[in-house]
C-alpha cells in the first residue's frame, strides 16, 4: 500500500459524482452522503478507488431500472484510531441466505439469478475483500432476497494505523477521478528489469484480468 495524507472528503465526492450519469441512464435514484467531519486523512487512493468502483458498480449491476442506490461515509473516533465507515446500499435483487456466507470466496457465483446487467466472473467481491485487507480494512454484507443489499466497509484513516514504510508524505496534486471500464492496478513489481518475464493472458472478463494482474504482480515480488 501507498498511504498518503489527502483530502478524503473531496476524493469520495469525486468518485460518487462519476456514477451520476450511470444512474441517470438506468433511471436509478442515486444519493451519496459524506459526513462533514471527514476531511484530511491517511489512505491509499488506488486501493480505495478500486474498492468503491467495484462495490458501486455491483450495486448498479444488480439493481433494476427504477430502483435506488445510496453511498454514505461516516467517521468513528476511538481513543487512538479514526475509522471511516462506508456503506453502499441498493434496492436490487438481494442475495439468497445460503449464498451470503460465500460471496467473498474466489470464483463463487451462487445460484442463477433473474436480473443482472452483465455476467459475473465470481471474483469481484473476493478481489475487493483482498484489496481491503491490504489496507487493514474489513467488509461485510447484509442482504435480503428481493429487497436489496448493504455492504459495509470499515477503513482506518489515521497515520498511526499504518507502518512507517507504507506512508508517503509528499502528496501530488489530486487528480479528478473518472468512471472508466477498467481500473488499472498501480505497478508494484520490484523485480530487476533484466529478470522480468512476459506473461500473455487472454481473457475478456475485466474482473478476472484485474484479479490475475494482482496475483502475478505479487508473485513477481516474492
Regions found by a protein language model. Name each.
Residues 21, 93-94:
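Glycine-rich G1-box
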Residues 2-17, 29-31, 49:
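A conserved beta-strand-to-alpha-helix junction within the catalytic ATP-binding
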Residues 108-119:
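Glycine-rich ATP-lid/hinge loop adjacent to the conserved G-boxes
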Residues 95-107:
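Short conserved segment of the HATPase_c
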Residues 215-221:
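Conserved small/polar residues in nucleotide/adenosyl-binding loops
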Residues 1, 40-43:
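Conserved micro-motifs of the catalytic ATP-binding
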